[in-house]
């Protein structure tokens, strides 16, 4: 009998966000691209979220897949993003990727920076 430990996804990568990433990758014409989500110092609350496309997964990266799209998180950023939800919204304020982070004790008004 084989026993495997199923680990829950470290974060939620919504179908809507994955669909938008897939659309952007198709526009770029490079099916090797993956979306990297990362945390950097800065912003009005101390840390800020960043998004970029990357062709390479680095040692220690966490990979989350949805709809044929891969999301990458480096080990340092991972600790701040566990349990978060990556989504994409379109509204009167414009269209943007949104991170709903249960680890953030405070966030700024724009939602792009936080403090753990």
From Swiss-Prot:
Annotated GO MF terms: 2 iron, 2 sulfur cluster binding; 4 iron, 4 sulfur cluster binding; iron ion binding
Record HAMAP family: Fe_S_insert_ErpA
PANTHER family (alphabetical): IRON-SULFUR CLUSTER ASSEMBLY 2 HOMOLOG, MITOCHONDRIAL
Pfam families the record matches: Fe-S_biosyn
Annotated PROSITE patterns: HESB
Stated name of the protein: Iron-sulfur cluster insertion protein ErpA
Matching SUPFAM superfamilies: HesB-like domain (SSF89360)
Cofactor(s) essential for the protein: iron-sulfur cluster
Cofactor mode of binding and number, as noted: Binds 1 iron-sulfur cluster per subunit.
Subunit text: Homodimer.
UniProt gene name: erpA
Keywords, ordered alphabetically: Iron, Iron-sulfur, Metal-binding
Ligand binding (iron-sulfur cluster): 44, 108, 110
Protein family (similarity comment): Belongs to the HesB/IscA family.
Biological function: Required for insertion of 4Fe-4S clusters for at least IspG.
One annotated GO biological process: iron-sulfur cluster assembly
InterPro entries, per database record: FeS_biogenesis, FeS_cluster_insertion, FeS_cluster_insertion_CS, FeS_cluster_insertion_RrpA, HesB-like_dom_sf
């Amino acid at each position: 009998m084989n026993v495997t430990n199923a680990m829950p996804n470290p974060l939620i990568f919504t179908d809507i966000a994955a669909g938008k990433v897939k659309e952007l990758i198709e526009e770029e014409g490079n099916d090797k691209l993956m979306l990297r989500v990362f945390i950097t110092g800065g912003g009005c609350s101390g840390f800020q979220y960043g998004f970029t496309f990357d062709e390479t997964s680095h040692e220690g990266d966490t990979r989350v897949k949805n709809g044929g799209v891969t999301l990458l998180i480096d080990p340092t950023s991972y600790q701040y993003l566990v349990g978060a939800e990556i989504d994409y919204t379109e509204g009167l304020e414009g269209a943007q990727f949104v991170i709903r982070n249960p680890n953030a004790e405070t966030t700024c008004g724009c939602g792009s920076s936080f403090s753990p």
